[in-house]
């Protein structure tokens, strides 16, 4: 038997007294930011867990880099869809972008494609053919909306779909 335990995190916007600087803090303790990571106060930026989901270290690192670029006058914006998530199980589970439920809730007309790893020469050669890859596409623009991968090294493979989303591939 195996058990996966995931622990939660809580934002601390009130604990750091961000309101004293005029920064808006939600009831839950998050600090809202726009896609350039700006708070409601000019020249105050927010990054990391305190600005909301997903609460992942690699998201915070990416946000910090983007905030520095924006402060330096470069054109940059944060798109949470490009932050992948991975469950380090066996086999691994990785996903990024929109899920089917999110696409439906947003009224997006989408199509999906899936590929079973039992048909993958690489997976068969590795002796690990359990798994699959699933992609969601906008039905009209044919642009990638999201991806999910279950299988060995899924956490590494998901980065290829992130690149496709960032580049606006269709």
Locate predicted features.
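Short amphipathic alpha-helical segments
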Residues: 43, 83-84, 145
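Solvent-exposed alpha-helices and their adjacent loops that cap or buttress functional pockets
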Residues: 38-39, 43, 79-80, 125-128
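A conserved FAD-binding loop/helix module that cradles the flavin
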Residues: 47-105
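FAD-site-proximal beta/loop scaffold in flavoenzymes
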Residues: 2-71
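Short, glycine- and charge-enriched coil/turn segments that flank and shape catalytic ligand pockets
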Residues: 22, 27, 73-77, 106-109
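Short beta-strand-initiation
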Residues: 3, 82, 130-132
């Amino acid at each position: 038997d195996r058990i996966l335990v995931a622990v939660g995190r809580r934002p601390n916007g009130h604990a750091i007294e961000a309101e004293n600087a005029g920064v808006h803090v939600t009831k839950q303790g998050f600090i809202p930011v726009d896609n350039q990571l700006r708070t409601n106060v000019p020249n105050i930026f927010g990054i990391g867990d305190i600005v909301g989901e997903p609460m992942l270290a690699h998201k915070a690192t990416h946000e910090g880099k983007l905030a520095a670029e924006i402060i330096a006058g470069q054109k940059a914006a944060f798109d949470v869809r490009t932050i992948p998530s991975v469950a380090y199980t066996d086999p691994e589970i990785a996903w990024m972008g929109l899920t089917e439920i999110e696409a439906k809730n947003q009224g997006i007309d989408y199509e999906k494609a899936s590929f079973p790893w039992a048909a993958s020469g690489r997976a068969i050669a590795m002796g690990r053919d359990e798994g699959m890859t699933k992609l969601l596409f906008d039905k009209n623009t044919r642009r990638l909306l999201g991806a999910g991968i279950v299988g060995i090294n899924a956490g590494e493979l998901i980065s290829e779909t992130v690149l496709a989303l960032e580049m606006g591939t269709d």
